[in-house]
């Protein structure tokens, strides 16, 4: 199972770097969401639960430095990149720019719909609604000049830099602790959680955009897509190395203060909230660095082995397997099904999350061998193009 990278990109018309990033992103997201179901554990730092063992501590530190507020930002960067590819795909088929932007907006509306289904009916941790809203908000920028794109990014990012630490400071002060109690409890049933989410799902994307800077990361995705950093990484290695090295350094340094809280440092809860705000803001750069890092990896792959091809297969079907992963977390960990979240440790929850991701890799590989698209990718494209005959293409 080894192919030339050129053959893969020509035959599949896909960016190897982009799909590798998407496939890995799913692992980071499922690891980020697993602790949210550990309702029997005491709150730790922010959304992390208190460590009960050395292995729990390792999982929490890995989460703070590598996953939390970085996986989400990486997802947003890749979303922005995908919006540009969707626009260019329409223009390459002879559509005018306004029609292409209309298609992108329609796609964003359907992502919101998928997010509603995930949050309300499946009960998973949804971010699709927030990214659908982001797609609608940034769609006018798809036609703008680079100067306008940079100006918009600068204004939005400065506003977030000013307000995010303050908002989180007051938020944690209101909570009165360093961490959040889980949103799930042993008394939850499918009916009760569904009815509650049915009432409050419109608030989810608004709250996410208010508390987390999604838009700057999406705009960064538009920016690196304009330079084709992930489509043509070989031609942009200097930029990729610069962004990745600087971005990872900022991301790791930005995570240091949060890692000290509760062990080496016991600040006021307001200060802890502000530190979390800094962690979130530096995650913007971290998410960008993760994406460009896969540009470097993609440029270095001369022949794709079994694991690389399997990861690419997963990346092509990232929408389908994002939803599947979230559904499996609900089934395995939440009280509405197997209720393991009330009985397993943080480390075991991480192992369950990794197992879910491995299952997704295996299923995606089987689908690739049988030339099968992801069912949600197929559905999304049919909805976008209103059941017209379309070119068969995996991914979204």
What are these regions (language model features)?
Residues 137-155, 223-246:
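Solvent-exposed interhelical
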Residues 51-65, 188-203, 265-273:
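Juxtamembrane membrane-water interface segments that cap and precede transmembrane helices
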Residues 14-24, 240-248, 298-328, 372-384:
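Functional transmembrane helices that form membrane-embedded active or gating regions
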Residues 155-227:
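Long hydrophobic alpha-helical segments that form multi-pass transmembrane helix bundles
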């Amino acid at each position: 199972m080894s192919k030339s990278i050129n053959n893969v990109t020509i035959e599949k018309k896909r960016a190897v770097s982009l799909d590798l990033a998407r496939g890995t992103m799913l692992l980071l997201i499922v690891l980020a969401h697993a602790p949210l179901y550990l309702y029997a554990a005491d709150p730790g730092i922010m959304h992390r639960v208190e460590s009960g063992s050395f292995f729990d501590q390792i999982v929490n530190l890995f989460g703070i430095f590598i996953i939390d507020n970085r996986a989400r930002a990486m997802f947003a960067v890749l979303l922005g990149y995908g919006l540009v590819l969707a626009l260019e795909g329409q223009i390459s088929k002879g559509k005018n720019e306004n029609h292409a932007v209309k298609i992108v907006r329609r796609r964003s509306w359907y992502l919101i719909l998928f997010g509603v289904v995930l949050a309300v009916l499946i009960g998973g941790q949804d971010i699709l609604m927030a990214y659908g809203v982001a797609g609608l908000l940034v769609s006018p920028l798809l036609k703008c000049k680079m100067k306008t794109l940079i100006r918009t990014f600068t204004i939005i990012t400065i506003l977030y830099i000013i307000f995010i630490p303050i908002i989180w400071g007051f938020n944690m002060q209101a909570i009165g602790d360093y961490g959040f109690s889980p949103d799930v409890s042993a008394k939850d049933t499918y009916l009760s959680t569904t009815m509650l989410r049915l009432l409050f799902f419109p608030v989810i994307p608004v709250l996410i955009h208010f508390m987390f800077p999604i838009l700057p990361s999406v705009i960064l995705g538009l920016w690196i897509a304009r330079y084709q950093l992930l489509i043509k990484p070989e031609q942009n290695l200097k930029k990729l190395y610069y962004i990745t090295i600087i971005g990872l350094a900022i991301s790791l340094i930005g995570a240091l203060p949060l890692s000290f809280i509760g062990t080496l440092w016991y600040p006021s809860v307001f200060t802890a909230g502000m530190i979390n705000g800094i962690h979130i803001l530096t995650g913007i750069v971290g998410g960008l660095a993760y994406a460009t890092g896969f540009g470097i990896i993609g440029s270095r792959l001369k022949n794709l082995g079994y694991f690389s091809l399997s990861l690419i297969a997963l990346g092509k079907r990232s929408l389908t397997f994002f939803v599947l992963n979230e559904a499996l977390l609900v089934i395995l960990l939440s009280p509405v099904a197997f209720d393991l979240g009330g009985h397993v440790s943080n480390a075991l929850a991480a192992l369950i999350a990794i197992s879910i991701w491995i299952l997704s890799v295996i299923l995606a590989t089987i689908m690739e061998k049988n030339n099968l698209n992801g069912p949600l990718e197929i559905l999304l494209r049919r909805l976008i193009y209103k059941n017209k005959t379309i070119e068969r293409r995996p991914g979204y």
